[in-house]
Amino acid sequence: MLKLFSAFRKNKIWDFNGGIHPPEMKTQSNGTPLRQVPLAQRFVIPLKQHIGAEGELCVSVGDKVLRGQPLTRGHGKMLPVHAPTSGTVTAIAPHSTAHPSALAELSVIIDADGEDCWIPRDGWADYRTRSREELIERIHQFGVAGLGGAGFPTGVKLQGGGDKIETLIINAAECEPYITADDRLMQDCAAQVVEGIRILAHILQPREILIGIEDNKPQAISMLRAVLADSNDISLRVIPTKYPSGGAKQLTYILTGKQVPHGGRSSDIGVLMQNVGTAYAVKRAVIDGEPITERVVTLTGEAIARPGNVWARLGTPVRHLLNDAGFCPSADQMVIMGGPLMGFTLPWLDVPVVKITNCLLAPSANELGEPQEEQSCIRCSACADACPADLLPQQLYWFSKGQQHDKATTHNIADCIECGACAWVCPSNIPLVQYFRQEKAEIAAIRQEEKRAAEAKARFEARQARLEREKAARLERHKSAAVQPAAKDKDAIAAALARVKEKQAQATQPIVIKAGERPDNSAIIAAREARKAQARAKQAELQQTNDAATVADPRKTAVEAAIARAKARKLEQQQANAEPEEQVDPRKAAVEAAIARAKARKLEQQQANAEPEEQVDPRKAAVEAAIARAKARKLEQQQSNAEPEEQVDPRKAAVEAAIARAKARKLEQQQANAEPEEQVDPRKAAVEAAIARAKARKLEQQQTNAEPEEQVDPRKAAVAAAIARAQAKKAAQQKVVNED
């Protein structure tokens, strides 16, 4: 009896609220075995066939590809896609995909070469020796995703389960009408499906493994029981046929009695669910080394002559599959991808088959009935009775229609599985699922916008905080700079404090006066001399500053000096190269001396008439002195080369000596009348004084060497002496005036 009760508890199933029993319409396609479809000429492979971001392209236009070759790289939740056959990549461009609005997504377009060559396949028959991480990575890189309709990456799902999974559920319910892809797969490939289940169990290490299958699939149930006859680790649970018992939350409750919490996942209660087709794809990826390049697709509907289930390559155009099955379209033919309750109508037939495509339904005009007009809600609550998620579809309809997003969220519209049971039972023919889909899309867009706004606000606040910190740091630096004195100020303050302390120390010392001693004023005298030296140093700095603004162009002065030196050298060379027999004409020499004296007198008159404010450029004066010296040397050489019989005129010599002395005195007066700030080069002055003294001595020697017979005219000598005395007196007076 206890064993009976234990077996009853072990095989117990639960029932969920709501649900409907629509016509199954499965016998149209589940009676024929799986078959292959001829290769299409062109394949369109969308890069995104799963939940998550698209992968990174690793092929380019013109590349040759083989079947199973990766077209994208998968990182994180990015699942790679693979070439369904061998051929050439002819384009990488947006193309309409399996979507209610046929939205264009980036796709790789391949022209098949007809050879259908595989890449080298490396199967892991000994997968039990592989680590959990290696198996998960292989499943992910081989592109395996949930084939039941969600399209969630299987590797990511297994990784997220971790060690907290106690129950592994294999969903074999396939509850929606018309769809028989999983049914036919279990009938034809039951052993491979079970092998894939064992691989998943090896990765997750669950406490129990449950296969949930509806009782309307007797052939599949028989095949699974035959394969599991010798297995005690996998339990096959047959459940009543009820739509939507194949939903993840509903099947979890049916088999375990546990409910997935609101906003949570099945892994939160220790349950992980995989589809039958996913288990088969895992087996082919791990053991056979084949990426997912094809899947089972149901072709059904009264508009198809040969309904059944086929192996459809991913990327095959829908039109190609339907034509192979004998598609006979009517005038207003409808083609539905998926089932009649959860599927969507295709806007055109050139969309490709993707990983989540499980059925192509082409009903006739009478099969689904005439479309009926939407009417007003009568509040019959039939939708609430049929809802398997225990929601209030009537209220959600009003909130969705009135754009009341907050109230729709409060009434848990996110828990709607969009099964269509409410729309099926609605007597007013209201397309409730369409309203709910639109409302959830709008809420998702609003949340996305709020997320972006929050991120922008966070960035703005971070920027403001950074600017405030920088501003506070600048103010602190300014305050510190204002409080702390500079290095120069510190030195001045220290010197002032030292002087104050010295004065205080001197004030505290007693003054002792001794009789007969003189006061020692050496310190005072030294301080006075120091102040005078400091004043002279400042005056010299000011004079240098003023000289920098008033000096003549140094380049012009240098050029003039260079020209004078060149002329002097030229004259010296000419005189040195002259023949010794050639004699200098004394008359020409006398004329040149007279011209020089006239120029000197003219220069003296111009300088005497000049304004006293005008300053004499010492460099120009030096250049003129150099020119005068050169001319004097020339005259001296000419006189030395003259005939020895010719005697020097003592009167001319006296006049020239007087002129030289007058020029020397005038130069001294000009230097004395210059501004006190202007400094005369002492070396130049010494050179000029030495030259003047040399000229004077030379003239005196010439006078002493003159003939004694020749007498000087006393009147001319008296006149010259009077002129010299007058000039000396005038120079003395001018000097006194300048000193005052």
From Swiss-Prot:
Primary location group: membrane
Residues noted as binding [4Fe-4S] cluster 2 in the record, renumbered to the chain: 387, 416, 419, 422
Cofactor descriptive note: Binds 2 [4Fe-4S] clusters per subunit.
Residues that hold [4Fe-4S] cluster 1 according to the record: 377, 380, 383, 426
The keyword Iron-sulfur is annotated on this UniProt entry: yes
Molecular-function GO term, any one: 4 iron, 4 sulfur cluster binding
HAMAP family reported in the protein's UniProt record: RsxC_RnfC (MF_00461)
Record's function text: Part of a membrane-bound complex that couples electron transfer with translocation of ions across the membrane. Required to maintain the reduced state of SoxR.
SUBUNIT field: The complex is composed of six subunits: RsxA, RsxB, RsxC, RsxD, RsxE and RsxG.
Protein name (record): Ion-translocating oxidoreductase complex subunit C
Gene that specifies this protein: rsxC
